[in-house]
């Protein structure tokens, strides 16, 4: 099974201010996951990024520089999708018949973010993603494929991937690939999301379509594309959760 702790290979540093909705989620003071600002007061990330003490940074590019664009928030409540199997967080083992479905979670910030050039909300998708489309994933995840050595960059990285048929992922991974997941990668290998990119966005043809969820280690292996939570499947849950928990 893939390591479920959070999950860029073959990417490059993103352009400054090209990713103002990108969130860096910390557990206490250590970087853990990416996320996306979906509302001034709400961040969407992966459910497997759940922790007991969130620190959330917006407006970041280099995590090791003092950036005047940065905004820092605590979290007043977390809402993992009720269908996600939280037992996956414990010993990273799963009961038979369980899978990595519904890997998304909302975090409510202690106060609304201030919208600036470096901090913006990303719109949810309004149409189905198109197979074969070019997608961009971004994050501060490992730039080394692992599993023995992971190396984390200072600056956020962006990588171009292709949206593939789910059968490519089903053939590549022993775990179940469901209709609420997207499959994206680069089949020759060498480009992929990796450990620490989880919870970040997958943007296809300019529209936000996925959340980085899980994949194979070493990252970027040929014919082993990664799995992303399919956002359009969850619009009602996202909107209802935000509305019901002001």
From Swiss-Prot:
The keyword 4Fe-4S does not apply. Its EC number is 3.4.21.35. It catalyses: Preferential cleavage of Arg-|-Xaa bonds in small molecule substrates. Highly selective action to release kallidin (lysyl-bradykinin) from kininogen involves hydrolysis of Met-|-Xaa or Leu-|-Xaa. InterPro entries: Peptidase_S1_PA, Peptidase_S1_PA_chymotrypsin, Peptidase_S1A, Trypsin_dom, TRYPSIN_HIS, TRYPSIN_SER. One of its GO terms (molecular function) is serine-type endopeptidase activity. Glycans are attached at residues 85, 239. Residues 1-7 form a propeptide. The active site is at residues 48, 103, 198. Disulfide bonds join 14-158, 33-49, 135-204, 169-183, 194-219. Residues 85-104 are annotated as: Kallikrein (autolysis) loop. SUPFAM superfamilies: Trypsin-like serine proteases. One of its GO terms (cellular component) is secretory granule. GO terms for biological process: regulation of systemic arterial blood pressure; zymogen activation. Residues 8-243 form the Peptidase S1 domain. Pfam families: Trypsin. Gene3D superfamilies: Trypsin-like serine proteases. It comes from the Eukaryota. SMART domains: Tryp_SPc. Keywords: Disulfide bond, Glycoprotein, Hydrolase, Protease, Serine protease, Zymogen. Monomer. Glandular kallikreins cleave Met-Lys and Arg-Ser bonds in kininogen to release Lys-bradykinin. Belongs to the peptidase S1 family. Kallikrein subfamily. This is Glandular kallikrein. It comes from Sus scrofa.
């Amino acid at each position: 099974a893939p390591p479920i702790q959070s999950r860029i290979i073959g990417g490059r540093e993103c352009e400054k201010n090209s990713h103002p909705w990108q969130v860096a989620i910390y557990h206490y003071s250590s970087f853990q996951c990416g996320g996306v600002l979906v509302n001034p007061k709400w961040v969407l990330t992966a459910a497997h990024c759940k922790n007991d003490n969130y620190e959330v940074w917006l407006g970041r590019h280099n995590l090791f520089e003092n950036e005047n664009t940065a905004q820092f928030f605590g979290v007043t409540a977390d809402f993992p999708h009720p269908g996600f199997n939280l037992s996956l967080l414990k010993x990273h083992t799963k009961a038979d018949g369980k899978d990595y479905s519904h890997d998304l979670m909302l975090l409510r910030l202690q106060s609304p973010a201030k919208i600036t050039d470096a901090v913006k909300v990303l719109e949810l998708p309004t149409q189905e993603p198109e197979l074969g489309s070019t997608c961009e994933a971004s994050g501060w995840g490992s730039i080394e494929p692992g599993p023995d050595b992971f190396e984390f960059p200072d600056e956020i990285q962006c990588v171009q991937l292709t949206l593939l048929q789910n059968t490519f992922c089903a053939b590549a991974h022993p775990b179940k690939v469901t209709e609420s997941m997207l499959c994206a990668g680069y089949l020759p290998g060498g480009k992929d999301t990796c450990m620490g990119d989880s919870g970040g966005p997958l943007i296809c043809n300019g529209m936000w379509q996925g959340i980085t969820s899980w994949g194979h280690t070493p990252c970027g292996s040929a014919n082993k594309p990664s799995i992303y939570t399919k956002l359009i499947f969850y619009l009602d849950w996202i909107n209802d959760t935000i509305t019901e928990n002001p």
